């Protein structure tokens, strides 16, 4: 990594930047650093936005195309063909974690490189329940609860009763159960229940929301863990079997809508805060656990492993985000490759 000896080969490619805004600019900047031409897209509403201005200033005659929607896969493929793109970077959001889209990019008659994990890995790790089952098979700790999609109301209620009983047996003062859309993400499709008598109505609401938003009624029932740190492990892998981590981030400061507001790196810093547990040991454990999953599936791009760490220092894996993220720049700031800083994780991903 950071040895761009293949740059002459890279220059034979053109990257379709299938996104907008901040991440589109980061992708274009990485392409410029690597000497790769790019093609950006924009909608009528975005004609004066930053990524459009950047593409006009730094791109060539095929650097910018107008589309009707960032969500129209057919239109993206058409732009790729017209401009001669050989690779596509989805950024985050939109198609970034859509394994069907990634498969289409690589399997179409005029195939392109999908700059992200393989579609099979996105499919495997993109489902929280698949990830949970894989983690448990490797001895990686996960939040107590179901490890497969639940579609039956009675089955879901039985699981919820077991989770409530588990918390009562462990003298948890205010037992709570989370009902989560298994295909959800970004804090969407999650509600909590503190009374089993209220379970069915909340379950139906989450199930209906999941069907509308994610086209999948699958629901995950888990213990609601209170008073925790939300810690992330930044992973990067290549297609030659190498996976490494770029440290940890703490994103516990979030809005009421579970949107991250502040990222701190590393995940714990005993020189700043005092902890009731061995914070260095916990960070070592979660990076080791994260890499074990990455190596098991042959992870081959940038990704983030999301963890809950309780106030007693017990870590539980929540999910894997199979994409580049807004906060990847925080990890880059605390990392070095062969003693050199100035890391660009988007460039490394490409």
Name each region found by the language model.
Residues 1-138, 147-159:
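ATP-binding N-terminal substructure of ATP-dependent carboxylate-amine bond-forming enzymes
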Residues 148-150, 191-194:
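Generic detection of short hydrophobic beta-strand segments and adjacent strand-loop junctions
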Residues 153, 157-166, 204:
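N-terminal loops that bind phosphate or other acidic moieties
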Residues 160-179:
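Acidic/histidine-enriched active-site and ligand-binding environments that engage anionic O-linkages
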Residues 80, 164-168, 211:
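N-terminal cationic-hydrophobic initiation segments that often serve targeting/anchoring roles
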Residues 54, 119, 164-166, 246, ...:
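A residue-identity detector for tryptophan
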Residues 3-38, 60, 71, 81-83, ...:
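ATP-dependent carboxylate activation and anion-phosphoryl transfer catalytic cores
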Residues 142:
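Active-site helix-to-loop segments that bind/position phosphate- or nucleotide-bearing substrates
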